[in-house]
Amino acid sequence: MANEYLFTSESVSEGHPDKVADQISDAILDAIFQQDPKARVAAETLCNTGLVVLAGEITTFANVDYIEVARQTIKRIGYDNADYGIDYKSCAVLVAYDKQSPDIAQGVDEGAGIDLDQGAGDQGLMFGYACDETPELMPAAIHYAHRIVERQSELRKDGRLPWLRPDAKSQVTLRYVDGRPVSIDTIVLSTQHAPEMQHKDIEEAVIESIIKPVVPAEWLKDTRFLVNPTGRFVIGGPQGDCGLTGRKIIVDTYGGAAPHGGGAFSGKDPSKVDRSAAYAGRYVAKNIVAAGLAERAQIQISYAIGVAKPTSVMVTTFGTGKISDEKIAQLVLEHFDLRPKGIVQMLDLLRPIYQKTAAYGHFGREEPEFSWERTDKAQALRAAAGL
């Protein structure tokens, strides 16, 4: 008897208040890295109606106009009118950055602390995941949820649907049979819109112009579409909800298809393993699947603050592995340097590449800056596995 179930993931657009905060935090990081690639940055952002607050810990010699970076990020997203709840020209921006604690710094700085190698910036556990449900080796539900809100942004910015506003959320429910996605049961898209628009016009445009162009037609035969199910979505963005950095960690990763260690990414330089080790985990898992060692691969990595080597590395392939999980884990340790310094070098992370990651997912995007999406280790892994 076939095993059937439904699985759901969501995404949000770049105009969602939490994503506005994430993008400001990563824009700050990039602006600093353009001058000082070895800076220590933990940039947090809060945005509300007409207000942006920048706080956190930054140690750098870079001279950055943080207020202007925040304003230009808000402008790029599309909040250029006070009627939208926040306007880059008139919003207040408060800056309250401190420097990194010297107690933390001595554990992270190479040559300082008990472990003379560059230690992890904190304790914690991180997960990486990949599967063969999409060409990008991502879970299908989060992949299509991202593509829907990405399409919403595209049609808003190029003027084809000029009544769209920046804030939007998508949700995709997939039907699985024996562990494989076969169709889409439900798609939800809530999109902010101009006040004069009628619901029926919004619904038709969303289904025909946003959803159908980015989702496989064969998966839409019996799909239920829920477009702005409250009936109206005019007040949105930071006016509708206060936005905070780091509140969309499942959207940022695998849409709930894999565990999450709890650490957010945006605004953090790669000495923070919350970010860099999660990127390394994706790199490892994607290469395992690309090598044909498994159909699904999940890796957990953990660290102690100030210590370079991971405290644990575990690989799970959910019964899909061509060799044992223990053997794959051994190959991972042989082919990937998972010390913080090794990750930074392996993935070339001391670059101003992070603002692009802060909307539409950190994983599963074939962007040239996203070094963790490379599959350049797959051939060596396959050979070492004897396949």
Swiss-Prot record:
Record: residues binding L-methionine: E57, Q100, D241, K272
The encoding gene: metK
One Pfam family from the record: S-AdoMet_synt_C
Primary localization class, coarse: cytoplasm
Protein name in the entry: S-adenosylmethionine synthase
This protein's pathway: Amino-acid biosynthesis; S-adenosyl-L-methionine biosynthesis; S-adenosyl-L-methionine from L-methionine: step 1/1
Species name: Janthinobacterium sp. (strain Marseille) (Minibacterium massiliensis)
Sites where the protein binds Mg(2+): D18
InterPro entries in alphabetical order: ADOMET_SYNTHASE_CS (IPR022631), S-AdoMet_synt_C (IPR022630), S-AdoMet_synt_central (IPR022629), S-AdoMet_synt_N (IPR022628), S-AdoMet_synthetase (IPR002133), S-AdoMet_synthetase_sfam (IPR022636)
Subcellular location: Cytoplasm
Example GO BP: S-adenosylmethionine biosynthetic process
